[in-house]
Amino acid sequence: MAFNFNWSPLMADAGFYTRAQELLTAALNKSPKPPIIVDDIVVTELNLGSNPPELEILEIGDLAEDRFRGIFKMSYAGDAFLTLKTCVQANPLNTYLLTRHPFASPQPLAAATGLTIPLQITLSDIKLSGFVILVFSKQKGITVVFRNDPLESLKVSSTFDSIPFVRDYLQKEIEGQLRILFMDELPAIIHRLSLRLWGTEYSELETTSAQVTNPPLEGPGLDPLLNPPEDPVDASGNVLSTSEIASLSLDSGVEMHSLFSRKNVLRLAALTDSQRTLSLFTPSIQEVVFRAWTGLMEQADGPSGLVSPMSPPLSRTHSHVATSSLSLQDAASLASSSHSRLSLPSTGFSGYGLSMGAGRHSKAHARKRKKRVVDLRRRPKNTDDMESVSGESEFTESTSAASVFSGSTIPEENNDDPVTPPGSPPRTIRQPTLCDRIVARNGAERNARRGIPAEFGHDIPASRTTLPTANDIARMLATTSSLQQQLHPANSKSLPPQVPPQEPALRPSLTSNSPYPIEKPNASNYTSSGDSQQQQQQQQQHQTHLPSSLIMEAAQSGGILEQAWMMKMASEIARRIQDEKMGGEDAAGSSNNKNDNKNNNTGGFWEQSLMRSHTPPPAYRH
């Protein structure tokens, strides 16, 4: 099958060449150019020649009146030519030095600046050979796709043909650009040209887009600043009259740009005075700009938020003043009661109570809170009442501390809450309680020191929070023995054991102010032997200066369970001592001298059984 190409109509149409030159120019400048080319590449001449290409049909996929699809083998060796015009850099050394450090450049240079030379290149003797896929449709135009690189050879003629290395360089670069042109850009160019020829809708759409891209010039635009505002003012803020505006406009039109509206100036001044933020409660400090961020008071708002008096927030000044006054009173009360029994939860409680009234809202918009004060502290009326009521002096407080906490809101708490009220300042004189007098009276009736039986060491309630230490028991026994030496009569009669009443329920505390370390209770800690009696005598000599009020200090500093256990231990010890004393008198009724010796040397069944053990308790091992 043969084809007849009507090549002459393409050459006769002048508009076709013009559109083809524009498309080729855009395609050549689309890809990045080498650094030696410093100007755009412009297609000045285009001629397809008189010899058409040769096509060999390999396959026809679709054939109809308005569409065609086929695969061809194309070969072209005609007289078509193409002329390009651009500018090149005549100093390649300068182009090379632009990408290098100045320290590495040779000095001096023969030509430190580049010389731009116009270049004209003509491409001729183009030979093409390749496989082409051709698709034709009246609605979609012509689509040409090359399956391989069709460019075989071409001739490049330029103004630098007399310089061999420049000629070879241009030949190599232009061939590379043309290969990209045939594979990527030429099919798109042919498709757009075919749409212009057969598709009227595409031509109208392209014309409309060109008008939008390049709008026609309707004359110079109007300057809105040349029109004076309604209430003009000068640079100093003074209102200008109509005559002053007319005089300014007659002199020169430049002065009109310095006129501003009075409303705009006032708004700008208000914005400047507000320190560039929207917060209405910022401190008025000159030359300081505050941002409208969330302050510390808003971030720490809630039951767990504690505000430090050393870092007050900047958002609300009136709230900050109230917070500072309360914080100062709280600091004074804490300083006066540095040795009081304040635990960690109670400290957080007092801080939360003070921060309740310092919220985000001002006092003007806040509701009045009920100042309900739950006072759990007991104050002694006189010395006689203190002697009759046990444990009452533990919660005596100063008047200043009460005044501080009465001004803050204290929420109601359950009785099981381990939070304690603020402690009292240190006291120098402490009155003996009822428990102290009972223990002193029971200890005065004993003739010799008895050890604590081992079976009592395990009689500990399971619900106790803190265990009594061996040092507390030793200290109690040492104080009792010292009182027994002072108050021991010649012939004392045995008294029936008396169980002291328990103290009223006090509020438990998590911490204890005992100066002795907490030790794990063991049976051996409560047993006494020959070695333990010597060590207890040494402790007695060292602790004789302690007052009798320290006997029940560990019990009073603990909770209800600790006090009950200590009272039970004291009553059991007193009862056992009385039983042993009565048993020793009955067994040794033959002579009074032997009875005295037994009372002084032996301690009954418990101490005789404990004397057999010579192993020291684990608490005294080294």
From Swiss-Prot:
Keyword terms: Lipid transport, Lipid-binding, Membrane, Mitochondrion, Mitochondrion outer membrane, Transmembrane, Transmembrane beta strand, Transport
Subcellular location: Mitochondrion outer membrane
UniProt superkingdom: Eukaryota
Free-text comment on this protein's domains from its UniProt entry: Lacks alpha-helical transmembrane segments, suggesting that it resides in the membrane via beta-sheet conformations similar to those predicted for other outer membrane proteins and porin. The SMP-LTD domain is a barrel-like domain that can bind various types of glycerophospholipids in its interior and mediate their transfer between two adjacent bilayers.
Quaternary assembly: Component of the ER-mitochondria encounter structure (ERMES) or MDM complex, composed of MMM1, MDM10, MDM12 and MDM34.
Biological role: Component of the ERMES/MDM complex, which serves as a molecular tether to connect the endoplasmic reticulum (ER) and mitochondria. Components of this complex are involved in the control of mitochondrial shape and protein biogenesis, and function in nonvesicular lipid trafficking between the ER and mitochondria. MDM34 is required for the interaction of the ER-resident membrane protein MMM1 and the outer mitochondrial membrane-resident beta-barrel protein MDM10.
Protein name: Mitochondrial distribution and morphology protein 34
